[in-house]
């Protein structure tokens, strides 16, 4: 199948930005245990480009399912890579980092998959009040930023305390301030799974009813 240039989603501007995010994340992974400056800048830039590709998609009218999936996968893989490193740096808290990975990956995957199954135009479109509130642009951007900032601060604290404010480490202060929001985001991720489970169960019920109706004999006809 030949794809016209204006329909080739693989070279859409937001998806090209998505590829750049992947490259930056890979560079960050490579240096994550040895060079926090290179790794930190690459990771943060990759995360910040998450907002840029969304703006590009709207500006160029290039919103695609492929782009949405690429964006989700890059987010999940990027955060997972950082959390794996944090589990290595802070083995005492390994369970919590493992739990964070499990919640983040499983809940978002289920939510995305359910959105596809029920035929939604976007995973951000949902009837649930909490989901609608969470996916408002300003709230979503804030929650994602403070969540990433929390983990980045923990990462940087392994190497340096950073600038001091009244004798206290800036990175440590930011970690304490953003930590509660990271916990809140994890709870919202669990809510994603709950809402997706309800929607998916509704699909199962509807399909089972349709199969029963097809298997039942038509009223008034003789069954042989």
UniProtKB/Swiss-Prot annotation:
Its EC number is 2.7.8.11. Gene3D superfamilies: 1.20.120.1760. It is a multi-pass membrane protein. In adults, expression is higher in the head than in the body (at protein level). Mg(2+) 1 binds at residues 50, 53, 71. Keywords: Cell membrane, Lipid biosynthesis, Lipid metabolism, Magnesium, Manganese, Membrane, Metal-binding, Phospholipid biosynthesis, Phospholipid metabolism, Transferase, Transmembrane, Transmembrane helix. It is found in: Apical cell membrane; Lateral cell membrane. A CDP-1,2-diacyl-sn-glycerol binds at residues 54, 58, 64. Its cofactor is Mn(2+); Mg(2+). It catalyses: a CDP-1,2-diacyl-sn-glycerol + myo-inositol = a 1,2-diacyl-sn-glycero-3-phospho-(1D-myo-inositol) + CMP + H(+). Disruption phenotype: Embryonic lethal. In follicle cells, abnormal apical accumulation of the basal membrane (BM) proteins trol and vkg. Decreased expression of strat in follicle epithelial cells. RNAi-mediated knockdown in both larval salivary glands and fat body, results in small salivary glands that accumulate lipid droplets. This is likely due to the observed decrease in PtdIns levels that would lead to low insulin pathway activity and defective cell growth. RNAi-mediated knockdown in the fat body also results in a decrease in PtdIns levels in the fat body and a decrease in fat body size. Residues 30-35, 98, 160-163 are lumenal. Mg(2+) 2 binds at residues 50, 71, 75. Its main location: membrane. InterPro entries: CDP-OH_P_trans, CDP-OH_PTrfase_TM_dom, CDP_ALCOHOL_P_TRANSF_CS, CDP_diag_ino_3_P_euk. GO terms for cellular component: apical plasma membrane; Golgi apparatus; lateral plasma membrane. GO terms for biological process: basement membrane organization; phosphatidylinositol biosynthetic process; phototransduction. Changing residue 107 to W: In follicle epithelial cells, apical accumulation of the basal membrane protein vkg as apical extracellular aggregates. Although Mn(2+) can act as a cofactor, it is much less effective than Mg(2+). Belongs to the CDP-alcohol phosphatidyltransferase class-I family. This is CDP-diacylglycerol--inositol 3-phosphatidyltransferase. It comes from Drosophila melanogaster.
